[in-house]
């Protein structure tokens, strides 16, 4: 069942259009080298991050991490496909993919989600599949 141990989280994920803004944000962060955004007040949040936070605030706390994991997985696949089209080296892809998960891990804290501060994604970097 992928990241969704709870069927209702899968439903929330679909209703939230797969956290579209979060996916775009994760994608953007993955493509930028350097460290991701530090937790900031809402004033300094880029609009896209703000949209992503809004999406996460609509989830039940229980579903925040599973839906984020689903979004991360989707972005990972996009990046992998793009990388193959551009003939990217595996190592660069791994960096980008690990940045997706780094960014996603801290999103609940960046977004001040109640009762969720960090999503414990496994840092296991799967080899090229």
UniProtKB/Swiss-Prot annotation:
SMART domains: AAI. Keywords: Allergen, Disulfide bond, Seed storage protein, Storage protein. Residues 32-47 have a biased composition (Low complexity). Gene3D superfamilies: Plant lipid-transfer and hydrophobic proteins. The keyword Disulfide bond applies. It comes from the Eukaryota. GO terms for molecular function: nutrient reservoir activity. Residues 28-47 are annotated as: Disordered. It holds the Pfam family Tryp_alpha_amyl. This is a 2S seed storage protein. Belongs to the 2S seed storage albumins family. The mature protein consists of a small and a large chain linked by two disulfide bonds. This is Allergen Bra j 1-E.
């Amino acid at each position: 069942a992928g990241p969704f141990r709870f069927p209702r989280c899968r439903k929330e994920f679909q209703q939230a259009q797969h956290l579209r803004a979060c996916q775009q944000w994760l994608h953007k962060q993955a493509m930028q080298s350097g460290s991701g955004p530090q937790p900031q007040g809402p004033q300094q949040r880029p609009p896209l991050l703000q949209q992503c936070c809004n999406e996460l605030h609509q989830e039940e706390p229980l579903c925040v991490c599973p839906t984020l994991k689903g979004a991360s997985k989707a972005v990972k696949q996009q990046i992998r496909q793009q990388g193959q089209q551009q003939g990217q080296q595996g190592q660069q892809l791994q960096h980008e993919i690990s940045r997706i998960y780094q960014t996603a891990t801290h999103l609940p804290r960046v977004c001040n989600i109640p009762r969720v501060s960090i999503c414990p994604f496994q840092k296991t970097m799967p080899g090229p599949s």
